[in-house]
């Protein structure tokens, strides 16, 4: 595997961008996310190490940005989920779930025929330790979720608690988990292979909406939140 960043030249349209390597040992990188993991005000990188082989099998990692990223041969690697993310994990979410001021991390794992472990089809979140270089504590979200891929922290129903919005990108449906019991609610149960997810206030009414592209259904859609966790599907385009 390879995690790298591309340095933009002064004129971004003239010639190539410089490739800077951050890590070469994480294996099976399907998701890459930026976020401040250790609370130092600087953006770090997060990646999954989804393959069951290699130096960090079935794991999740974050990479601390060095003081001189242009000169560093690699970034300082920390494993937040060591061997406890089996089942072909996909994408990551970052945000303070439990209100302790630290950045927690979430992932989904698709499972399915290519998952030799038979331990996928889940959404987990990892509670940040009080010393972020140390491993985080894993928490399982309810249910079995064939094809689980995307998950992001978001306040879904206006109660001030951080919830999760998620998609089963190799399966069916867009859902959200309601804190603190993580009750599962359907946003759209019928979309096939919604393999991406964005959470944002689309209509600028003060609550968080969601958007996805479902390549099985060949639909791009966004989901309007009424502020109480009830979502209405709006089709942006078909045959996509």
Where are the regions that the model predicts?
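Beta-propeller-forming repeat regions
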Residues: 1-240
């Amino acid at each position: 595997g390879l995690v790298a960043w591309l340095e933009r030249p002064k004129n971004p349209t003239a010639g190539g961008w410089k490739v800077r390597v951050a890590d070469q040992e994480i294996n099976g990188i399907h998701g890459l996310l930026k976020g401040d993991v250790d609370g130092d005000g600087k953006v770090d990188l997060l990646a999954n190490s989804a393959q069951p082989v290699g130096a960090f099998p079935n794991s999740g990692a974050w990479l601390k940005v060095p003081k001189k990223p242009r000169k560093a041969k690699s970034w300082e690697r920390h494993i937040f989920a060591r061997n406890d993310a089996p089942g072909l994990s996909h994408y990551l979410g970052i945000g303070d779930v439990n209100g302790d001021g630290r950045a927690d991390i979430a992932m989904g794992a698709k499972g399915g025929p290519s998952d030799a472990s038979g331990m996928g089809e889940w959404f987990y979140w990892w509670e940040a330790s009080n010393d972020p270089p140390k491993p985080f504590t894993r928490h399982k979200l309810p249910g079995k979720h064939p094809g689980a891929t995307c998950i992001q922290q978001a306040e879904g129903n206006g109660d001030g608690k951080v919830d999760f919005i998620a998609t089963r990108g190799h399966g069916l449906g867009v859902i959200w988990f309601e804190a603190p019991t993580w009750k599962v609610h359907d946003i759209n149960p019928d979309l096939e292979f919604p393999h991406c997810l964005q959470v944002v206030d689309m209509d600028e009414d003060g609550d968080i909406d969601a958007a996805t592209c479902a390549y099985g259904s060949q639909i791009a859609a966004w989901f309007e939140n009424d502020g109480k966790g009830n979502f209405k599907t709006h089709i942006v385009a078909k045959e996509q």
